């Protein structure tokens, strides 16, 4: 269980899996059999069946059992005792052989142990809180990866459709130029230029199809099944979660990010462990009692022994174990404190990175949309100019390429903005199953 928490925290403070995947997705977007698929309904399946989340839930169950186990020393002990054997007693010159039998009931209740027992319970409860926060971090990591996979499918599909349309348009234009050359209205150079662009368009389509199929395979690995159709993501469902400013987001993240909450709980739990470390040197008070019956003893029949008492134990020397254990715990606390400092910096870094990408893609969407409109107008003008002999075939081909580039850039900017939107929520620690409308199985 502890190893699981450490693994997630180490991964987070070294950059975070979800942030690396997010940056990778943005790079892909900017550079390069089922029912209709609604992302939120598809995420429900991931939330229910993902093995990493399942392991986190198992760790939480183990931590809950640890809390119960920590309370056992607060409970009384009650047990049955008994023994039977052979004995010989010599008295007045006679030997007496007999088989004494002893049985009874005993109990013990610890009343005080220097506060170590209560510290043990509090430490277990805090450890449970840490594991629960760690599970929240795991859930958000997995859900962010799943969302990125869904967005990449949408982006790859849109780019594929644009390339297919471009191939169709250039194919028609190539046929037009070739026919014009047959009647002497264009040159073989024009035909060669149109043919070259058509071949590049075909390559662009093949590459876009490959990127789409790769995105589908990533989706299949994460989600299990691939829907027949992917529906665009409805951000209105989670729009209210988005912060007003990066300052508000940072303040919220530093209070609520699950990795920070897990580390905070671990630090407090470790401080409780100092009291536990001194357990072997702390005084203890027990209440003990017993009722015993002894039979088969010569001259003594039906012996009943009842006793109850308070037992005080004050250790004087334990070979230095308590102090060594306490020093080890203090060193562990210092290490956790350094992890908290680093984790806080990582939270702020990841949040600012996601926020900056979101803001830049807001601008990119508007800029690329304006570029699309301008390139459409430019293409119409170039085509008209060619019809009147003022523009060449190469001018038209270049205008077609500019229009395709701006359309692809606009598509990628839209999907990069959606990815950044969810990355901001994840960096805040707010990409929870509840906020996404998911229900625990």
Residues of each region from the PLM?
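Periplasmic alpha-helical coiled-coil/stalk elements that build and connect Gram-negative outer-membrane
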Residues: 14-17, 138-252, 354-357, 361, ...
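Sec-dependent N-terminal signal peptides
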Residues: 22-31
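Acidic, low-complexity, intrinsically disordered peripheral segments
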Residues: 12, 36, 409-441
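Small/polar (Gly/Ser/Thr/Ala-rich) solvent-exposed segments
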Residues: 54, 77-98, 108-137, 261, ...
């Amino acid at each position: 269980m502890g190893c699981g928490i450490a693994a997630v925290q180490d991964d987070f403070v070294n950059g975070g899996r979800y942030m690396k995947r997010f940056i990778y997705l943005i790079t892909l977007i900017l550079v390069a059999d089922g029912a209709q698929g609604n992302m939120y309904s598809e995420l429900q399946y991931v939330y229910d069946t993902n093995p990493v989340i399942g392991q986190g839930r198992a760790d939480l169950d183990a931590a809950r059992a640890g809390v119960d186990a920590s309370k056992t020393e607060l409970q009384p002990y009650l047990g049955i005792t008994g023994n039977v054997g052979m004995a010989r007693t010599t008295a007045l010159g006679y030997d007496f052989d007999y088989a004494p039998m002893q049985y009874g009931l005993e109990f013990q209740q610890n009343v005080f142990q220097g506060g170590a027992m209560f510290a043990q319970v509090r430490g277990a409860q805090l450890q449970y809180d840490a594991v629960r926060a760690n599970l929240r971090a795991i859930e958000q990591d997995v859900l962010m990866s799943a969302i990125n996979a869904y967005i990449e499918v949408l982006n790859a599909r849109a780019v594929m459709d644009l390339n297919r349309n471009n191939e169709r348009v250039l194919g028609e234009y190539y046929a037009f130029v070739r026919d014009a050359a047959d009647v002497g209205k264009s040159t073989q150079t024009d035909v060669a230029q149109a043919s070259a662009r058509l071949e590049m368009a075909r390559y662009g389509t093949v590459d876009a199809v490959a990127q789409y199929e790769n995105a589908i395979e990533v989706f299949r690995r994460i989600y299990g099944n691939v829907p027949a159709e992917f529906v665009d993501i409805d951000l209105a469902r989670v729009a209210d979660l988005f912060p007003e400013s990066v300052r508000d987001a940072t303040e919220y993240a530093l209070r609520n990010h699950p990795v920070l909450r897990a580390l905070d709980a671990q630090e407090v739990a470790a401080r409780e462990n100092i009291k536990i470390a001194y357990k072997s040197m702390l005084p203890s008070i027990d209440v003990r009692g017993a009722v015993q019956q002894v039979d088969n003893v010569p001259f003594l029949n039906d012996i009943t022994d009842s006793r109850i008492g308070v037992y005080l134990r004050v250790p004087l020397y334990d070979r230095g174990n308590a102090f060594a254990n306490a020093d080890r715990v203090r060193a562990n606390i210092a290490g956790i404190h350094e992890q908290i400092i680093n984790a806080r910096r990582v939270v702020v870094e990841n949040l600012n990175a996601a926020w900056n990408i979101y803001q830049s893609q807001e601008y990119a969407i508007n800029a690329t949309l304006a570029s699309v409109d301008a390139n459409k107008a430019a293409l119409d003008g170039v085509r008209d100019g060619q019809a009147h002999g003022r523009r060449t075939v190469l001018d038209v081909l270049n205008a077609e390429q500019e229009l395709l580039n701006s359309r692809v850039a606009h598509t990628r900017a839209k999907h990069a903005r959606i990815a950044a939107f969810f990355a901001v929520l994840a960096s805040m620690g707010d990409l929870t199953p509840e906020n996404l409308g998911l229900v625990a199985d």
